[in-house]
């Protein structure tokens, strides 16, 4: 490794990451970054999840205020890895305890998250993101440090350059391929992608019914 690459890697690893929410996505990211040598730490509401993560060697806590205060002291990139319905409460806690920290999230919709962040006065330090990865399982037991390998990680445009750089950095460290777009385009594309399997299944069902027994008009009404 040449000196420039080495110094860049050392700079990246030296930047702390605080992951709020240790389900499949947040927990997998914590495991991946910890294995890569990042000073990564996390929080989860569930005591059992905290215990499991700690038993696996992770730096975790069940005290959200203390975790966010630590993030503020260390200028950690805060990754909000909670469901959309829980996001507003988390954002309000970040505004109270770590308002200057760079901020991102991994929620699958971006326009609504941006609105919540703007209402809390945190837009200047926020860059949304969405790793296009997952499984049918959930919880700490389902976490996998290889979950993001070769997956697309979408990073939103329009944010501060320094925050964008840190979000891109963790995406690359997770093994993902970074794609940039704006929140509106992202949400439109994700909506289309999510509907494709249903549309294909419906088309195949209609074709099968029409070919085998006729009655295409009836099939289309179902």
Region locations from a protein language model:
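Internal alpha-helical scaffold of NAD(P)-dependent oxidoreductase catalytic cores
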Residues: 145-222
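Hydrophobic Val/Ile/Leu positions in short beta-strands of Rossmann-like dinucleotide-binding domains
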Residues: 18-19, 80, 155
């Amino acid at each position: 490794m040449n000196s420039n690459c080495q110094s860049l890697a050392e700079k990246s690893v030296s930047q702390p990451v605080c992951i709020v929410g240790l389900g499949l996505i947040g927990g997998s990211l914590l495991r991946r970054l910890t294995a890569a040598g990042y000073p990564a730490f996390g929080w989860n509401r569930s005591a059992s999840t905290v215990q499991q993560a700690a038993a696996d060697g992770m730096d975790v806590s069940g005290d959200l205020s203390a975790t966010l205060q630590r993030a503020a002291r260390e200028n950690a990139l805060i990754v909000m890895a909670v469901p959309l319905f829980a996001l507003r409460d988390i954002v309000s806690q970040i505004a109270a305890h770590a308002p200057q920290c760079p901020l991102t999230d991994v929620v699958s919709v971006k326009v609504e998250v941006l609105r919540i962040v703007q209402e809390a006065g945190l837009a200047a330090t926020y860059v949304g993101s969405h790793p296009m990865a997952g499984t049918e399982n959930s919880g700490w037991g389902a976490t996998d440090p290889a979950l993001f390998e070769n997956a697309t990680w979408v990073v939103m445009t329009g944010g501060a350059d320094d925050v964008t750089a840190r979000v891109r950095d963790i995406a690359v460290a997770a093994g993902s391929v970074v794609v940039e777009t704006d929140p509106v385009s992202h949400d439109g594309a994700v909506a289309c992608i999510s509907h494709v399997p249903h549309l294909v299944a419906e088309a195949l069902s209609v074709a099968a019914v029409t070919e085998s027994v006729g009655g295409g008009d009836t099939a289309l009404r179902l």
